[in-house]
């Protein structure tokens, strides 16, 4: 099977040259994957129609604006080892729209702040010599007696850090994120998100830097990057500009429009029915590129998919997400992009300082702190009123010691459903059942992106699946399901900067251009 590194560029099948191929490609979803695919198609002169059910572009990579404040939902560092993605970013936005930002994250645990990734000196100082020795011995012990079951997230992390560090720095946070024990989750999530990380890596990397031995970016573990690019008005400006370019290139982008049916006839998708403001339209198509949740895609197929496929779709699960954004004086901010909250006595999982991402997201003299809560749609937190959520966020921010309650000037709530696909013990089989059905019965339906493939991809990996999918439509045979799975791809892909990558400054001292009104 061909991989992203070994494309088969055989010409398209003869059937693709008939009138059917003159129909547009319908792209479902206006997030990074969908808009990247649409841009690639439009640039090649192919007809394309994007349908996005929301009124805001970018999916989870959007920038939300309220009263002139801008929020990056989930936080999106623009760092990649994938050259075409890097080049695409700079094709969409000019150099002056990027800032170069310092990467800084910490863990709040036991009333103390720990550097993340874990640094030896800081951890020793906070844990104390005796507990640090215990953690070291615990790590050595798992080298001799590794966990019997490393197929779970718990087993995967313990095998890399030891039991004591797992309990200190991973257990509580992961249970907040997923709402279940890490022993009930697949190791796949850890393999994607912390691949290449271990206690040894965390100790050796700072020593390497202190000795002046900087790693080439092509071998750098992504979790250890020291700086990253960032659009000055947040990630949403990338996707708003991308959609504008799609339209300029002859494509069509429809907002507040929902795909309600994907019609399959004769072994392929032939049309997509969309709905907007009470009316519907059937759009004939040559291909469907879908970044809608894989569960939703299976449910809109007409005629319906078999019971086995429907059951697999129903058994895929998601974790939802909400941000409580609190406006506070600038001096109440912190230098981190975010702080992971491992304290079990508060429900917040992570706190962003939007001013540390970009001064253009906040207003002079004040900053905005994003309290991030991991929830299930319909649970107590999700259904809580905005006023009560702002009160909860204020209370927990004060409990942690970052602000006094009276410092909070205003608060806003943003809810994001289906933010994280859950890697439980059945997800892989369920995805394979759905994937196999589409490959056999509607091969011109192409799932892409995080929710489209039910894969916890980063933004760049989601974009790359879209790029490879467009190449497949044009005649190649890439295996897009290997993206962010193969070790070689994830760890050693070339990472030169690409054209136009010169940035306009670093850190909080990046040049501040006149802010737009509001």
Short names for language-model regions:
Residues 6, 414-417, 425-518:
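C-terminal lid/capping helical subdomain adjacent to the catalytic/cofactor pocket in oxidative enzymes
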Residues 20-21, 44, 255-402, 406, ...:
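Mid-domain catalytic core of redox enzymes
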